[in-house]
Amino acid sequence: MTITPLNPTSTQQPDSLGRFGKFGGKYVPETLMPALLQLETACKKYSQDPTFKQELQQLLRDYVGRPSPLYFAERLTAHYTKPDGTGPQIYLKREDLNHTGAHKINNALGQALLAQRMGKQRIIAETGAGQHGVATATVCARFGLKCVIYMGIHDMERQALNVFRMRLMGAEVRPVEAGTGTLKDATSEAIRDWVTNVETTHYILGSVAGPHPYPMMVRDFHAVIGVETRAQCLEKWNGLPDILMACVGGGSNAMGLFHEFINDPSVRMIGVEAAGKGVDTNKHAATLTLGRVGVLHGAMSYLLQDEEGQIIEPHSISAGLDYPGVGPEHSFLKDSGRVEYYSVTDNEAVAAFQRLSQLEGIIPALETAHAIAYLETLCPQLSGSPRIVFNCSGRGDKDVQTVGKFLEG
């Protein structure tokens, strides 16, 4: 088996201050600046280091199971075929088949290798759906690193399976009761820990959020998704996809897919957020749809906030999308018009969760189901037979109980 090289063709980077336009930056306590500078230096050094790249590629192949397949969803395609025989050809980038069941392992693995080279033996991370926590616990077990995971108490209840998996692999899972006990609160606690233990500890942030260099670094570790997708599309039909789709919470799986194609104007890109109980309610997580610019967790981006600038607590049936911010590069791509962002409700996501399960025998993560759900709106608008690739970012074993309770009423 050959492994796809990890060199994305897109040249877009943040500037020297870590900004994408006006978004991004480093809004952090002074105590964290040395750690961020050390991390930035390590990123620059090892991204060009042949030994590091070879080790990462070998682990992605032999441990993670890359490349992940690009699967033609025949029955889902038939579901959206019009009476005249036209309709989109739908392909799934199967990140759910990675070791640990989601895209999160790509980034966790890369950061663990960096942490080793920086001499950090203690790892902390935040998690919402539990997939990033599981991926982090996995790589810490693989490399013999001490692991502490911060997780909101509410998320621990709805993602009990992943909590057990993390503890099984030797991680300490610390419940966070502050706020609503969800992803934002877990992230805040992880940052507090990092400030206190910065000399010995590396923070494996799980999304393209946070202060520079995290949005760039996490994107680049996930860019293998888009690099593989380009090669697989060229192999299958000797061309590029017409449309890319991915769910967006913090936005790491979407950036991993989109980044490779940013400079291909023929490729339309769509990110799908969580509308929760509806964007006309206060129970949603549609940051790019309804948010305003502010600073959270070390970066400037779109945020859900009230008139006084206080963060509004988000809501989504999906723990991984239940976040009041978004990665700064997504904010930049929204304002530049390069990527379109829409939102779907809990009800629509659950219907899509069932639809993919019944039509393809693939149970998607609830996060992924949001992207699938937008096909209901998108497909009737399309003419001809465009090729759609959507990122099947994770598997849905973790969400079966949540969906069961939701359907019971």
UniProtKB/Swiss-Prot annotation:
It comes from the Bacteria. HAMAP family: Trp_synth_beta. Keywords: Amino-acid biosynthesis, Aromatic amino acid biosynthesis, Lyase, Pyridoxal phosphate, Tryptophan biosynthesis. The modification N6-(pyridoxal phosphate)lysine is found at K104. Tetramer of two alpha and two beta chains. This is Tryptophan synthase beta chain. It comes from Trichodesmium erythraeum (strain IMS101). It is an enzyme of class 4 (lyase).
